Amino acid sequence: MRKLARNLGVTAPALYRHFESKEQVLHEVVREAYERFARHLYTALEGQTPLERFELAGEGYLGFALAHPRLFEVLFAAPDHLGWDTVPRDLEAQACALGQFWNDRVRECMDAGILRKGSPEDTAMTLWSHAHGLVTLFLRGRLRVDVEGFRQIYRDSHRRLLAGLATAEHGEQLSEDAAGPRTTRNDGGFVPSDHLYRTGT
């Protein structure tokens, strides 16, 4: 707690007036992270159609990760990395609510005939894993692109995956909406998509 207090620029006694232990501080950090994450995701409800709401949810996911990369890492860290045997129940409930929100976006796209019928939970897991993998690669410096270049990769790749899960009526349009295989590099030039991955350490 003393080290944490120094990093925050306050005294240890001042910190103890608000938190009993560093475990309680961590709990509060994760709780706040979930609330910020939720605010980003729930802007999707402003969408006018199931597809708009689904895509806005994806944008909210990306927006949170780019705005709060450290909190993003904390939210998806293994419990033992945070010093927990299990996730506290209130935090688990927050995580489940966000997972259900994502499932609901997929379910309403299925009901609207945009995505092929199937298990909303399984399809949501596929789409989430794709989004999370791309974001994690970028945040860890494994993609040779700037932020705007990554936004393009994220959106185009998302559309390609979505097209493969869509009904025949919507799949072709989603495929056409995805951009070409070139994106902006950090130096402002272009690099073929098959050379985006940074293999060096």
Describe each region flagged by the PLM.
Residues 1-24, 28:
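Helix-turn-helix
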Residues 71, 80-81:
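Hydrophobic, amphipathic alpha-helical faces that serve as interaction scaffolds
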Residues 7, 24-44, 52, 56-63, ...:
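Alpha-helical structural segments
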Residues 19, 64, 71-72:
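Conserved hydrophobic/aromatic "anchor" residues
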Residues 84-92, 110-157, 168-182, 190-196, ...:
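Hydrophobic/aromatic-rich alpha-helical bundle segments in the mid-to-C-terminal region
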Residues 36-47, 130-137:
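Solvent-exposed, amphipathic alpha-helical segments
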Residues 105, 160-168:
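C-terminal alpha-helix
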